[in-house]
């Protein structure tokens, strides 16, 4: 298994799919990285040599990935909560943030149902 950005990516998959195992790298970003390096997206990771892997590592390091991206996302949410704005309040109460209705659905965000106390 090749190690890129602190993540073991699978050898038996196409390079474009393997790169998506890195947090912050989706299909489009993976295609851009491989295009910049000059590798066909359908190439298996096991067929890549060390120079190609180093070139991919260099390209991936230009993007914000893994721990840095997770930290930035959590800091953005913390900033909203500290501001006390509507979105921050919704985050604090574990409710949907983007305007969805909560009368019937939103069970994923709200958690399991609580029994009525009588």
Curated annotation (Swiss-Prot):
Keyword set includes Metal-binding: no
Any Gene Ontology CC annotation: small ribosomal subunit
InterPro entries attached to this UniProt entry: Rbsml_uS13_C (IPR027437), Ribosomal_uS13 (IPR001892), Ribosomal_uS13-like_H2TH (IPR010979), Ribosomal_uS13_bac-type (IPR019980), Ribosomal_uS13_CS (IPR018269)
Database matches in Pfam families: Ribosomal_S13 (PF00416)
Assigned keywords, A-Z: Ribonucleoprotein, Ribosomal protein, RNA-binding, rRNA-binding, tRNA-binding
Compositionally biased tracts (Basic residues): 106-118
Subunit structure: Part of the 30S ribosomal subunit. Forms a loose heterodimer with protein S19. Forms two bridges to the 50S subunit in the 70S ribosome.
Free-text function comment from the UniProt entry: Located at the top of the head of the 30S subunit, it contacts several helices of the 16S rRNA. In the 70S ribosome it contacts the 23S rRNA (bridge B1a) and protein L5 of the 50S subunit (bridge B1b), connecting the 2 subunits; these bridges are implicated in subunit movement. Contacts the tRNAs in the A and P-sites.
Family to which the UniProt record says this protein belongs: Belongs to the universal ribosomal protein uS13 family.
Entry protein name: Small ribosomal subunit protein uS13
Organism: Psychrobacter arcticus (strain DSM 17307 / VKM B-2377 / 273-4)
Gene name per UniProt: rpsM
């Amino acid at each position: 298994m090749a190690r890129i950005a602190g993540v073991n990516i699978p050898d038996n998959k196409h390079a474009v799919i393997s790169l998506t195992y890195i947090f912050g790298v989706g299909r489009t970003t993976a295609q851009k990285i491989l295009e910049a390096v000059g590798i066909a997206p359908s190439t298996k990771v096991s067929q890549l040599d060390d120079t190609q892997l180093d070139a991919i590592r260099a390209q991936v390091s230009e993007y914000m990935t893994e721990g840095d991206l997770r930290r930035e996302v959590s800091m953005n949410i913390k900033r909203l909560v500290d501001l006390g704005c509507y979105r921050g309040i919704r985050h604090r109460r574990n409710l949907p943030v983007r305007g969805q209705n909560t009368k019937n659905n939103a069970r994923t965000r709200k958690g399991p149902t609580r029994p009525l106390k009588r």
